[in-house]
């Protein structure tokens, strides 16, 4: 009985159990965070390897708008860090109440599209430089 109780309790401590998510995007929070529905559950996702302006920072509205136009209401596929992402070995699989994941829309890397749009920066500490577009684009250390 103790084991069952511990297993049930542990399931509520983790934001998600699965590591591979396929679902519809419900809402975009900013240029690197969104909420999706996968397997009947709401999952908050932090896109790994990039950094976009937060609410109250310059560029927030543009970054959130670009991501929203790209994915809101659409089905995306997200792999949580540790499941073969560009951020494996560099990032934790969770951050606060979110999973950290590499996400795709129709097999197109969403993080790459955000950096190409100029609304998000490569964060090489976590991406290994995967999303660096050029020496003149922004880059987080």
Language-model features: where?
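Sec-dependent N-terminal signal peptides
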Residues: 3-12
């Amino acid at each position: 009985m103790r084991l069952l109780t511990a297993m049930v309790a542990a399931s509520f401590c983790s934001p998600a159990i699965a590591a591979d998510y396929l679902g519809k995007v419900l809402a975009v929070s900013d240029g690197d965070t969104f909420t999706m529905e996968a397997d009947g559950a709401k999952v908050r996702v932090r896109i790994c390897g990039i950094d976009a302006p937060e609410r109250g920072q310059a560029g927030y509205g543009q970054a959130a708008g670009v991501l929203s136009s790209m994915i809101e209401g659409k089905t995306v596929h997200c792999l949580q860090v540790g499941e073969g992402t560009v951020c494996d070995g560099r990032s934790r699989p969770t951050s606060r109440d979110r999973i950290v994941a590499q996400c795709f829309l129709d097999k197109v890397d969403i993080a790459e599209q955000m950096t190409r749009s100029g609304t998000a920066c490569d964060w090489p500490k976590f991406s290994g430089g995967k999303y660096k577009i050029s020496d003149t684009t922004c880059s987080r250390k």
